[in-house]
Amino acid sequence: MLDSMKRSAGILLFRRTTQLEVLLGHMGGPFWARKDAGAWSVPKGEYGDDETPEQAARREFEEELGLPAPEGELVELGEAKGSGKVITVWALEGDLDPGAVTPGTFEMEWPPKSGKLKSFPEVDRVQWFSVEEASAKIVSAQRPFLERLTAR
């Protein structure tokens, strides 16, 4: 079953301030515009057989945020299933200014059945959250990655 599922990979950037914080992106596009809880995600995306999951995670981080992932050692947080995909995520300690993010874009027909393509940002904002706050914001299928990060 897993072999037939789409695969996605991403990087959960974290930093230590007065507490452990993680960087999440609010999903872009009209479906997510007015949603908050469950509308934030690890920067991630799909990949094929032509790259490793780690390569895909680094590529997707840069595509979604417009900045390369900070230098450092990726620590695998394992896999989780969500939205018909198997998601592999790595933790990376580093810092990033959310104001420096220039997200990539995607196109979709909007309004529906209009025949018109419109461009939307992959993520419409990026923010640091405490793990507790992030747990309430993140897509539920990705919550295990927060739990695994704090268990380390």
Question: Where do the protein language model's features map onto the residues?
Answer:
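Short, basic and Ser/Thr-rich N-terminal targeting/leader segments
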Residues: 5-9, 85, 122
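The catalytic Nudix box helix
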Residues: 41-75, 130
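Short, charged/polar surface micro-motifs in flexible loops or helix N-caps
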Residues: 17-20, 29-32, 48-49, 83-86, ...
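N-terminal strand-loop-strand
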Residues: 2-41, 90
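Non-DNA-binding regulatory cores of transcription-related proteins
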Residues: 118-124
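Active-site-adjacent beta-strand/loop module that shapes the phosphate/pyrophosphate-binding cleft
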Residues: 78-115, 127, 149
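Charged phosphate-binding loop/patch that engages nucleotide di/tri-phosphates or the phosphate backbone
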Residues: 127, 131-152
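Residues that scaffold the ATP/ADP-binding catalytic core of kinase and kinase-like folds
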Residues: 34, 50, 137
